[in-house]
Curated annotation (Swiss-Prot):
ATP binds at residues 29, 71-76, 261, 328, 400. It is found in: Cytoplasm. A double ring-shaped homohexamer of HslV is capped on each side by a ring-shaped HslU homohexamer. The assembly of the HslU/HslV complex is dependent on binding of ATP. It comes from Rickettsia akari (strain Hartford). NCBIfam families: hslU, PRK05201.1. The lineage of its organism: Bacteria, Pseudomonadati, Pseudomonadota, Alphaproteobacteria, Rickettsiales. This is ATP-dependent protease ATPase subunit HslU. PANTHER family: ATP-DEPENDENT CLP PROTEASE ATP-BINDING SUBUNIT CLPX-LIKE, MITOCHONDRIAL-RELATED (PTHR48102), ATP-DEPENDENT PROTEASE ATPASE SUBUNIT HSLU (PTHR48102:SF3).
Length: 450
């Protein structure tokens, strides 16, 4: 795992802000200001790691507040950034939380979930590194079942070759595997700790583990199924769990990215008559303050410091304004970026330019049925026109409108594709108009369908 991680981090340490923006441009159209802001924030993380001495601990991330309508790319920018940087990434809506002392999730669960993601990431990398050894151990266990532990090396080698070639995939064997059957009465919520749950402990299991043993049971299964079960078992034995947890906590603390969406929904507008709701919203904001400023959160893996976690908050701010947030919270989100609403040209680019554009996705899906679809320029323009029209007349959901329009446009083709093998279908502006014009012109219908 060390080699894999080091190589990746060297690559991302070498990324300049302009290179980061170029990487984001491969998947996201427009929003240059937002891309620039996150690129600088990421580069500053790399710079901090190069600073020597105590000064490094004093340099904290400049958290970001993104302001923009739904579907303009706020979440996608943060998600792509996390993928680009090998960072644990956790997205949550601010409305999911309640003030400490009330029924619901508390804000500290954000960090618990972030660490869980980091642990899973580190485990996956570690298992990749020990995969060859784990596979060898799994084959040895299957050979013990097939030819016995006392068989000659010549016999074992012969059967090993057959396993590797897949000749014995459908051979049934009897083998001992870990017993993963859940024991006990399930789990229950811990009073006073919303979001945390506790399982009923099985005393025999606890004593068995303390003595270094683990429960197994003998099963009959095919060789290929046995390999799928035993390789992960052997991987677990080969990796250092304590080291994984230490690395995961370090990764979460120094490279974690938390994306808090809909933060405008917990802003106190003062216009609402529901005073209790206002107090509750303000309470959630106050609970977020220490988390964003820097505190220590206890998790099942150990204490985690939040001082250097990058927080990106976002909201549409249609009703509330950023100034309606608590002044202390505003101060902890010093970088503000306003994302632009999407134009017709943006919609056209979204359909065509990204490496994983919607047109490429739908073409690939239908192409699996040996049916090939091609969109003319006039069709793309018409789709973009309709997306903008419905966004203006019904509700502006940005690029997400394209998903619903394309689903309706290609519904008949998707349904009949399996019976149209070998056909090539050209989708032009007339085809788009025939499929969608009735829905678009009837706004009441458009509200439900698109």
């Amino acid at each position: 795992m060390k080699a894999t991680k080091t190589t990746y981090q060297k690559d991302h340490m070498g990324l300049t802000p302009s290179q980061i923006v170029n990487e984001l441009n491969r998947f996201i159209v427009g929003q240059e200001k937002a891309k620039k802001a996150v690129a600088i924030a990421l580069r500053n993380r790399c710079r901090r790691k190069r600073v020597e001495g105590n000064l490094r601990n004093e340099i904290v991330p400049k958290n970001i507040l993104m302001i923009g309508s739904t579907g303009v790319g706020k979440t996608e920018i943060a998600r792509r950034l996390a993928k680009l940087t090998y960072s644990p990434f956790y997205k949550i809506e601010a409305t999911k939380f309640t003030e400490v002392g009330y029924v619901g999730r508390d804000v500290e669960s954000i960090i618990r979930d972030l660490v869980e993601i980091a642990v899973n990431t580190e485990k996956t990398l570690a298992k990749t590194e020990v995969d060859i050894n784990a596979r060898e151990q799994a084959i040895e266990r299957i050979l013990d079942s097939l030819v016995g532990k006392t068989s000659s090396s010549e016999t074992r080698e012969k059967f090993k070759e057959k396993i590797l070639n897949g000749e014995l995939d459908d051979t049934e064997i009897e083998i001992s595997v870990a017993d993963t059957t859940p024991v006990g009465g399930g789990s229950f919520e811990i009073p006073g700790m919303p979001g945390a749950s506790m399982g009923v402990l099985n005393l025999g299991d606890v004593i068995g583990r303390a003595l270094g043993g683990s429960k197994t049971k003998t099963k009959k299964m095919l060789v290929k199924d046995a390999m799928a079960i035993i390789i992960p078992e052997e991987s677990e034995k080969l990796i250092d769990q304590e080291k994984i947890i230490q690395q995961a906590i370090n990764l979460a603390e120094n490279d974690g990215i938390v994306f808090i969406d809909e933060i405008d929904k917990i802003a106190s507008t003062g216009s609402s008559g529901a005073k209790n709701a206002e107090i509750s919203r303000e309470g959630v904001q106050r609970d977020l303050l220490p988390l964003i400023e820097g505190t220590t959160v206890n998790t099942k893996y150990g204490p985690v410091k939040t001082d250097h976690i990058l927080f990106i908050a976002s909201g549409a701010f249609h009703i509330a304004k950023p100034s309606d947030l608590l002044p202390e919270l505003q101060g902890r989100l010093p970088i503000r970026v306003e994302l632009n609403s999407l134009t017709k040209d943006d919609m056209i680019k979204i359909l065509l330019e990204p490496e994983t554009s919607l047109i490429k996705q739908y073409s690939a899906l239908i192409g699996t049925e040996d049916v090939y679809i091609a969109f003319t320029d006039s069709a793309i323009e018409k789709i973009a026109d309709y997306a903008i029209t419905v966004n203006l007349e019904v509700e502006d959901i940005g690029a997400r409108r394209l998903h619903t329009i394309l689903e309706n446009l290609l519904e008949d083709i998707s349904f009949e594709a399996s019976e149209m093998k070998g056909r090539k279908i050209t989708i032009d502006d007339k085809f788009v108009e025939n499929q969608l014009s009735k829905i678009i012109t009837n706004l009441d219908l458009a509200k439900f369908v698109l």
